[in-house]
């Protein structure tokens, strides 16, 4: 009988430990699930906003038009009024980057690639619109514009894929 009582006690103890672990882990696991879901939603909305603004401003058309003009006129200025005051700070970016650890590794990697491509385009666009490339040769201007147009298309395609993957 002692063996039966010991086995029963061991089983009862094991059930108690499992029950205790389940009740303490369940809220943590649920919170982690909610955090991951929120990170995907925040990131998806952020990327969607960038895509919407890029498509609204139709930067591809802007690049193509400027390429056509520069092919005809080497001295074409690439300056835009108001560009000097454009704010390059993105107050949402740190929030999105803080969520990286909650995303799948491949999604986090592609997100960083997308953000870096977008940053590079913004920097070059601002430099162009400030007239910082005006002293470059036609070939140099065309190289920058054509490279940026290719990066723009790649970034927009990657962004659209990320939005789907983040659902």
Name what the model sees in each region.
Residues 1-33:
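Membrane-embedded hydrophobic alpha-helical segments
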Residues 44-167:
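Interfacial alpha-helical end/capping and short helix-turn segments at domain and membrane boundaries
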Residues 29-48:
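Juxtamembrane membrane-water interface segments immediately C-terminal to a transmembrane helix
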């Amino acid at each position: 009988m002692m063996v039966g009582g010991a086995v029963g006690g061991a089983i009862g103890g094991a059930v108690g430990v499992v029950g205790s672990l389940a009740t303490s882990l369940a809220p943590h696991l649920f919170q982690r699930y909610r955090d991951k879901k929120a990170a995907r939603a925040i990131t998806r909305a952020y990327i969607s906003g960038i895509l919407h603004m890029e498509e609204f401003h139709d930067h591809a058309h802007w690049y193509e038009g400027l390429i056509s003009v520069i092919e005809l006129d080497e001295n074409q200025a690439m300056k835009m009024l108001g560009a000097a005051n454009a704010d390059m700070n993105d107050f949402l970016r740190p929030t999105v980057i803080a969520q990286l650890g909650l995303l799948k590794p491949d999604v986090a990697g592609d997100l960083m690639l997308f953000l870096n491509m977008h940053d590079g385009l913004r920097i070059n666009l601002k430099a162009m619109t400030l007239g910082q490339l005006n002293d470059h040769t036609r070939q140099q201007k065309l190289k920058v514009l054509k490279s940026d147009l290719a990066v723009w298309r790649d970034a927009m395609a990657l962004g659209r894929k990320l939005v789907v993957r983040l659902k």
